[in-house]
Amino acid sequence: MSSHSQEPVGEENFDDSEYDRPSKSQVKREMHALLDLGKELVELSPERLRQLPLEERLYEAIREAQRTTGREGRRRQIHFVGKLMRSAPAEAIRAQLDTWRNGSREETAAMHRLEALRERLLKDDDALTAVLQRNPDADIQHLRALIRAARKEAAANAALSQGQEPQRKQYRALFQALKNLSA
C-alpha cells in the first residue's frame, strides 16, 4: 500500500486555466519559422529589403549577415536575425514575400495567355472579332495591319533556307499591341 493518497486523474478534475499559454513545442515551431523567415530575408537584395517593413536594427542585422563570410559567424548572425524577428511584423513580411513570388507567376501566366492569343490571331480571323468584343476601343485598322504583317513575316520565314535567321519584328509588334490592350 502506498502512504500517499492519489486523486483520480480525469477530465472533471483537470483545470486548464493554468495552461493558457502555448506549449513549449509550439513556441519552438514559431521560433524556427521566424528563423527560416530571417534566412529568406538574408537572401534578398538590399533593394528588396528596403521595401519591407523592417526596423532599422533588424535591417542592419540582415545586412551584416549578408556581409559575413565565415560559416559560423554567418550562422550566429542569422540566429540573431531570427531573434530580432520576434518583434518584427512577420505576417506583413511574409505577405510581401508571397506577393513577390506569386506575382511573377501571375505575370508569366498573363504573358502565356497573350502569346496564345497572338497565335490564334495569326491562324484565325474570328479571334480578332473576340478581341474587339472585349476591347471595343481598340484600333481595328492597326491590329489588322499588324496581323497581316506578322502573317507575311511568318510566310517569309517559312521560305528561309536552313541556317538563316527568321525575322520576328512584326510578331513582337503584335504581341506588344496585345499587351497594351490588356493593360
Swiss-Prot record:
One of its GO terms (biological process) is assembly of large subunit precursor of preribosome. Disulfide bonds: none annotated. InterPro entries: DarP, DarP_sf. It holds the Pfam family DarP. SUPFAM superfamilies: PSPTO4464-like. Belongs to the DarP family. This is Dual-action ribosomal maturation protein DarP.
